[in-house]
């Protein structure tokens, strides 16, 4: 069996039946398709980590993130092949090191820009969803998936339980990616009153719209208020950045964002806390000896 044949078999028998998120399935499909012909035609039992590393190094020179995802596909598919006795290759950090990828720094709004954004987007149909992305740090799919049943008026809480994604030709509610993404957020009274005033949809969604229309409303606000090209996901980064800068504890921010680990939150946003150079002044102020 050639490597390309095994990858197609693995995709059909192990990826598709697993009911993964559509984006994850698409990622595996792209990675399988990306395997070059010279590598795919090699016999599975004869493929070595050296050949795989040679390919990943080539990919990483152009697109490091794609190389990372290609490695994930290879690692998981060949792990299954090894369990089935189809190959004996050892895939680990030594034989097939994870390609390094430093993501571009996300563009975010300043406090003043965020205010202008809210004023500009207030007249658009997706206003409430975009406001929740900015104030609560919701992901776009999470905002689109919000239903009236997710809102507890008495407790003033919003519970994130699903995300809305395109599946085939329609939009469907899908499970969140991780347990940590399930979370309840305490909303300010003003925001809760705004949600209560929202017209109730027949479908049960807080706002029944699409990612395309939501993006259209977002771009309208960006252009009309002459703001930097922050993305919808950048609204989430803005919330986290402003919260960290205001002194919000990282553990609390992790919970609010639905991150699976504290380290992920700290790596992304710790730099927005007060710089180490400010420590002496804070200690001196705390002593208040003069």
Predicted regions and their residues:
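N-terminal core-binding DNA-recognition domain of tyrosine site-specific recombinases/integrases
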Residues: 3-86, 103, 206-213, 228-234
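Phosphate-coordinating loops and pocket residues in cytosolic domains that bind phosphorylated ligands
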Residues: 8, 12, 46-49, 119, ...
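DNA breakage-rejoining catalytic core of tyrosine-based enzymes
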Residues: 45, 84-90, 98-119, 167-188, ...
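C-terminal catalytic core of tyrosine-transesterase DNA break-rejoin enzymes
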Residues: 65, 131, 135, 141-142, ...
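Basic, Lys/Arg- and aromatic-enriched nucleic-acid-binding interface segment
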Residues: 67-70, 83-146, 154, 236
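Active-site/catalytic core of tyrosine-dependent DNA strand-transfer enzymes
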Residues: 111-112, 163-166, 186-228
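Short, polar N-cap/turn motifs at the start of nucleic acid-interacting alpha helices
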Residues: 150-157, 229, 248-268
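C-terminal secondary-structure termini that scaffold catalytic or DNA-interacting sites
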Residues: 155, 166-184, 189-191, 264-267, ...
